[in-house]
Structures are given as structure tokens and as C-alpha cells.
Amino acid sequence: MALEKDEKTAIIADYQMHSTDTGSPQVQVALLTERINGLIEHLKVHPHDHHSRRGLLKLVGRRRRLLAYLASRDKEAYRKLIDTLGLRR
């Protein structure tokens, strides 16, 4: 589901590389992870919501591609991000 403005600002502040960074792979993956977690909770309550399930799969795919990009560019940042977000890889 959509993130509230203050939640999004807090996530960006936690993962940004510099004061105006809003688009680095680390920030994007963190935001996608929060949206994915919200959709997972939604689907636990509404298991037949196939439209949201498709959106979840698209978000997971986008996050996977961003993580692959980050792993190819900066292995150390990739490992640190996975540890802080608690992702399996």
C-alpha cells in the first residue's frame, strides 16, 4: 500500500547517501521493501485480492532488479543493505 509522507521521509533519511539523495538504489530498495511489507499484511487479511497480489509481484521484481544492480556495482553496500533490511539472499 501507499506510504504516508512522514514514513517515507523517515525511510529516506535512514538510507540516503547525502542530504538530497532520494533516488539511490539503497533508498529505492528500502522504500520498496516497506511497500512490499504493507502489501503482504494486506494480503493476509484479503487473500483473494488478486489485483494487489499482482502489484506485489511487480514490486518484488523491481526490488530484485535494483538489488542485482547494486550487487554488481557495490558489493559492500549491497551486503549492508540486506543485513539492515533483513532480506534473504
Swiss-Prot record:
Transmembrane segments: none annotated. SUPFAM superfamilies: S15/NS1 RNA-binding domain (SSF47060). InterPro entries: Ribosomal_uS15, Ribosomal_uS15_bac-type, uS15_NS1_RNA-bd_sf. CDD domains: Ribosomal_S15p_S13e. The keyword Membrane does not apply. GO terms for molecular function: rRNA binding; structural constituent of ribosome. Keywords: Ribonucleoprotein, Ribosomal protein, RNA-binding, rRNA-binding. GO terms for cellular component: cytosolic small ribosomal subunit. GO terms for biological process: translation. One of the primary rRNA binding proteins, it binds directly to 16S rRNA where it helps nucleate assembly of the platform of the 30S subunit by binding and bridging several RNA helices of the 16S rRNA. Part of the 30S ribosomal subunit. Forms a bridge to the 50S subunit in the 70S ribosome, contacting the 23S rRNA. HAMAP family: Ribosomal_uS15_B. Belongs to the universal ribosomal protein uS15 family. This is Small ribosomal subunit protein uS15. It comes from Roseiflexus sp. (strain RS-1).
